[in-house]
Structures are given as C-alpha cells and as structure tokens.
C-alpha cells in the first residue's frame, strides 16, 4: 500500500514540477528577451528633445545655427554630413537619423518582434511609390517627393529617374506593387485607386502579422494597427467631404480592417456634423477637445489621433513593461520629433520669426 501511495506522490510531484518548469520557461521566453532592449530604449527616450529644447532651436535664425544646436544630440552623426545647409539636405539627414532608429530596433529586439518594425518601414515604401508615380503623371520632378526611408529606397530613387512609365514597371517587377501599377498604366484604374490599393495591401499585411502573434503582443499590435486604419479612414472621409466627393467616391478609398464604422459619416453633409457624430465613438473624448479648431483645420484631427496613438501604446507599456510596447512607443515619439524638426527646418529656411516658428511647431505632432 505504501509503495502505491509513494508512486502516486512521486507521479504527482513529477507532474507539478514539470508544469512549474514549463510555466517558468514560458515566462522567461516571453519576457527575458525584452530586458536589455527595453532598458536601452528607455535610456534613449530620456534623450528625446524637450519643449524647451524646441524653443531654443526656434531661435536659431539660420540653418547653420540649427544644425550646430543639434551637435550634442543623436542627430549629430547624420547632420555631420551636411555641407550646403539647404532645407532638402537637412531633411534628408533627419530622415537618415530616423532610419537608424529602425535599424537599431532590428538589431536589439528579439527576433520574433523585429519583423514588425521592418513592416512599419514598408509604409514609407508605399508613400514614396505613390508620391513618385503621382509626380510622374503630373510631369513634376519626382525626386522632390521622396522621403529617404524604406527598404525599397534604391528602387524608389530609380523610379524617380525613370524616363517612361514602362521603365517604372520594370523596376517594380517582382514586388507586391507590380500588379496595381500594371493596372494603372493599362488604364484600368486611376492614380487615386492605385494609391488606395497600395495602402490596402500594406495594412492587410500588417494585420495578418499582428493576428499571427500571441497573447499581449497580439492584443497590442492588432489594436495599434486598427487605430492607424481608423485614422486614415477618418482623414480620407473628412478630406473627401472638403473636396466635394460623393459617399460612393469616398467609400472606394477606404481601408478595411479598422474598428470605426465610417459608413454613417459618409451621408453627413457638413464637417461640423461629421465631427459631432464621432462623439459616440471611442474617439469622441479626444476629438471633442479639438473639435472647434478642427472645424477650421481638419489636420488638427490627424495630430490628435497621433497623440492618442502614442498615449495608448504608452499605457500598454506601463502595464506590460517587458513587451514590444516600449520600443513601439519610442519609435512613434521619434517619428513625431523628426516631423517637428522637419517643419522647423522649412520655417527657418523661409526666414520666419522665432515666435511664429514656436507657435507652429507646437501644433505639429
């Protein structure tokens, strides 16, 4: 009898220890790989430019002074190559610095997470390809519309140098964008539909990736992407209304996969009533705060959405400090910082007064 009891106890203990070992392994596998990268990310976040620093930069007066004022920041490396101090050259240097941020994420993050940042970089490919094609069709210098980011940047630059639309097709051969571009030059779709199709493909790819993740990471990434889609669809709707487009025309430019039901908004005539309709949505709280200003300038909504996006990811990071949330929040803040610096470069280049620059850049998110 004792042997039987001992056997049962041993078996039970074996099962318990196996279960504990498995749970411990899962916890270590899930959280430990983020310990070093997230500690490094938090150190980098402490170096982001403060509002006081932006105010000091606004006093630069010249682009040479602006560049010199950033010598003690992370931008020093890319700005050190600036020689002509033109707006375009400095913008390229700032973009290069942002690209290095993404590259760093590839290096320090766990292998299972770094692919998401690679996918995020592909959005710059979509923007660049759409911008170059639109510029070519409008007979404008395409290189002026390129942002120096994205895995396909060499191909994008080659597209800008192409002499004919057919040359661009050869450059895009074998890429996901070849099919939509073929449809465009064949006359089956217009350039607006072409651009929409690029974004639909991109966000479908992002959502598929997010849904393939597990647990907290799946929750965060799925919500993050849905927020980005909602922002894009809402801005498309508002801009479409301002341009006098019909509900059918706006609907054809929307991206599937978001949480916001845009359909009721399509049948409202005025911007004011459209914004009021958003009160009952999950975005009502932050849109109410800027509604009056947004009725005069809808870009206010875009900036408010970007801030909301950062806030949501930062909140997730607070509850899940050893997750992809910390690096994602940092990249979003870095993108915002670069947008502000780019805006400041243009304003200084145009010779605007420091007080005007401070006011304008304070509104840029």
Swiss-Prot record:
Protein family: Belongs to the V-ATPase V0D/AC39 subunit family.
Q: Which Gene3D superfamilies match?
A: ATP synthase (C/AC39) subunit, domain 3 (1.10.132.50), V-type ATP synthase subunit C domain (1.20.1690.10)
Which protein are we looking at?
A-type ATP synthase subunit C
Do the record's keywords include Membrane?
yes
Assembly and interactions?
A: Has multiple subunits with at least A(3), B(3), C, D, E, F, H, I and proteolipid K(x).
GO biological process annotations for this chain's record?
A: proton motive force-driven plasma membrane ATP synthesis
Main localisation: membrane
Q: According to its record, how does it sit in the membrane?
A: Peripheral membrane protein
- Record's PANTHER family? V-TYPE ATP SYNTHASE SUBUNIT C
* Gene coding for it: atpC
Q: Extract the Pfam families matched here.
A: vATP-synt_AC39
The answer to whether keyword Cell membrane applies is yes
Kindly state one GO CC term assigned in the UniProt record. Answer: proton-transporting V-type ATPase, V0 domain
> What residue ranges carry the coiled-coil annotation?
none
Name the domain of life.
Archaea
Query: Which cell locations does it reside in?
Result: Cell membrane
């Amino acid at each position: 009898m004792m042997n039987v009891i001992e056997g049962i106890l041993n078996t039970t203990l074996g099962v318990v220890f196996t279960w504990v070992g498995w749970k411990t392994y899962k916890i270590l596998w899930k959280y430990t790989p983020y310990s070093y990268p997230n500690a490094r990310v938090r150190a980098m976040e402490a170096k982001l430019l403060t509002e006081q620093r932006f105010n000091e930069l606004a006093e630069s007066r010249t682009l040479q002074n602006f560049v010199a004022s950033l010598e003690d920041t992370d931008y020093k490396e890319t700005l050190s190559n600036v020689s002509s101090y033109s707006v375009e050259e400095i913008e390229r240097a700032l973009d290069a610095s942002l690209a290095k941020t993404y590259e760093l994420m590839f290096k320090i993050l766990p292998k299972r997470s770094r692919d998401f940042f690679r996918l995020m970089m592909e959005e710059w490919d979509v923007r660049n390809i759409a911008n170059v094609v639109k510029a070519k069709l409008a007979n404008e210098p395409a290189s002026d519309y390129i942002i120096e980011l994205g895995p396909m940047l060499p191909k994008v630059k080659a597209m800008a140098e192409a002499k004919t639309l057919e040359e661009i097709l050869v450059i895009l051969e074998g890429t996901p964008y070849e099919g939509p571009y073929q449809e465009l030059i064949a006359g089956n779709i217009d350039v607006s539909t072409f651009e929409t199709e690029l974004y639909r493909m991109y966000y479908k790819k992002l959502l598929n990736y997010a849904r393939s993740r597990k647990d907290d990471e799946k929750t965060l990434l799925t919500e993050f992407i849905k927020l980005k889609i909602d922002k894009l669809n809402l801005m498309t709707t508002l801009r479409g209304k301002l341009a006098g487009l019909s509900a059918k025309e706006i609907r054809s430019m929307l991206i599937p996969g978001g949480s916001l039901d845009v359909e009721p908004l399509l049948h409202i005539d005025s911007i004011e009533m459209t914004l009021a309709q958003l009160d009952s949505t999950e975005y009502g709280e932050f849109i109410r705060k800027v509604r009056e200003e947004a009725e005069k300038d809808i870009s206010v909504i875009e900036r408010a959405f970007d801030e909301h996006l950062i806030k949501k990811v930062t909140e997730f990071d607070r509850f899940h400090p050893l997750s992809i949330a910390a690096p994602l929040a940092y990249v979003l803040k870095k993108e915002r910082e670069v947008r502000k610096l780019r805006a400041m470069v243009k304003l200084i280049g145009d010779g605007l007064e420091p007080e005007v620059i401070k006011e304008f850049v304070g509104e840029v998110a």
